[in-house]
Amino acid sequence: MKSDKKNTKNSAFLTASFLLFCSGVAALIYQVIWIKQLGLVVGVDVYAITTGVSGFFAGLAIGSAVFGRLADRSPKPLRIYIGLEIGIALLGITATLMLAWAPAWFVALQSSTGVLAWALPFMLVAIPATLMGGTLPPLLAALKPEDASVGRMTGQLYAANTAGAIVGALIT
């Protein structure tokens, strides 16, 4: 009986690791595409990279904090995870399409609002990245690790996500 429970936990952990690996691949593919598109929006690669990376990491941090709290309180954290992944797909595609149209909007905003125009490309990246940042906490909450193994399990899940991010960056 104890062995069956351990096998179920191992299977759930491997599934969560695989999901986070795939999520990492997709996240970095989006990030690389968005940064390339931002170069066309703002016209200077260094500003595009700065805006893209800043928006991406701000979104990741906000998403982890917000959805971590929600996952801790939720009786069904996997539903949160599924909703986040669906939202990432929808917002990721939307952001990619909007970035294709953003150069004209950015120029018009920059003429009228100056530095505030930078909020447009920043937010186009930060909003979907917020959902990306929220994916690990619900999976961790669903696994319900014992207190003694929370740190180790969190690190292993982040490692799976990071490995996916490396693959995503390499194939883009």
Region spans (language model):
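Alpha-helical transmembrane segments of multi-pass membrane proteins
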Residues: 1-172
